[in-house]
Every structure is written in C-alpha cells, then in structure tokens.
Amino acid sequence: IVIMGWDLIYLILSFFKGWGADPNMYFNTNIVVGGNNLNGIFTPVVAVTAAVIFIWAVLWYISHKSVDGISKAVKFLIPVLFIMMGFIVIYALTLPGKMIGLTALFTPDWSALGNVEIWLAAFGQILFSLSMGQAIAVTYASYLPSKSKLIDNVLIVVASNSLFEIFTAVGVFSILGFMSLRTGLPIEQIATSGTGLLFVVFPEIFNIMGDVAYIIAPLFFLCVFFAGLSTIIAYLEPMSMA
C-alpha cells in the first residue's frame, strides 16, 4: 500500500512533471526520506501518509460492500487497465529505438539457465502473480458453482496472466529502448528493477518525451494504480471473509 501511495503521488505529479529535472534526487529526498537506507524510516512523509490514508479509505469503501462491491470494482478496474495499457503499448511501438528494447526482451541468454538466482526469481514471480498456495484462490473458489470446471478456469487464468505480462513487457521495453537511443546508454544500464525503474527511470523517460508525456505519464501511473488496487482487494478479501 505504501508503494501505491508513492504511485498516487506520481500520478498527480505526472500532469506537470512535478518530479523536476532530477527524478532520482526527487524520489530520495521527497518520497523516500533518507534515501535507500534506514536513516529516514521513522520520519513520516506527509504526502505519502495522506496518500496511504486515501487508499485505505478507497479499499474500505469497496470491501465493506462485501462480494458485490469487490465484484463491481474488479469488473471496472481490469477492463480499464487493459484499455489504458493497450494505448501505452501501441504508442510505445511507434517510438524510435523500440527495436533496441524488443531485441533485449526477446533475445535469450542461454547461459542464464545455469544461474540459480534466475530460477528463484522466476518461481517467485509465478507464485506471486498467480497467487499460488494463498488464501485468495480458496476464498474466490468458494463463490464458484459446485460444477465449475476447475482445470479450465486455471488454464484461462494462467494464460491470461502470462499473455498480459508479455504484452506489458513489450510496451515497457519499447520505451526503455527509446531511452537507450536518446541517452546513448545500454539498455542493461537503464533497466533497473523494482521501485527505481518505476519512480526514477520512467520519470526520466517522460522528461525527454516532450508534450506527449503529459498524456502517457498519467496513463502509465494510473495503470500501475489500478493494478495495485485490484491486487490489494484480492488480498483483503480472505481477511474480510474470515
């Protein structure tokens, strides 16, 4: 939820590129007080605190309506997420340098198959994205009719999840390829992982995109917000029904 709070702040900032010319400095001084260490862990950030409170209020409003409220929220969030991400991917594929990113995405490094950390990261991604072994699946399954085709449902969920992840990666790496072309830096150096990619690298990319970034950036951070909101709703459901 804290990361969603950061994203909500960046969603607002994206309308006027409020992170400034140095997104890394802005992130470490205004969002993560103390930088990437524990120096500022007990220093509250007013904007982040307000964003987290707002998100909890939205979650309460959705979840207190029980299954009906959650169902309506997800039926709205997921299709809108697909539409917005589709627009971003289509635009990303028009950017110069897109092939740099797509080549990096789809060119396999066979030597990595011998790296245990790669396998652990892959299994971790699968477990998290599919919610395997978690109470979410059990709770949602309890709402299904007794004659539901479990195997068919599993295949649909797995295929849909994997296809959307690949679809999203096409857009993300196309944009990273654009950044690589404009800056002259190798994509491996640009494509950091975690919050650095989301809150530092992408704002830097939006800074050099020009006026179109005032459309793409809000859509991007709104997609992240909707994805996070739908995920948290799923995690709250087992607790609310316990």
Show which residues each predicted segment covers.
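Predominant activation on well-ordered alpha-helical scaffold segments within soluble catalytic domains
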Residues: 9, 199, 203, 237-240
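Membrane-embedded translocation segments of transport machinery
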Residues: 71-233
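Inter-helical loop and helix-membrane interface segments of multi-pass membrane transporters/permeases
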Residues: 3-67, 99-120, 192-199
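Helix-loop boundary elements of multi-pass alpha-helical membrane proteins
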Residues: 65, 152-155, 241-242
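Hydrophobic core segments of alpha-helical transmembrane domains in multi-pass membrane transport
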Residues: 1-15, 50-63, 79-92, 172-173, ...
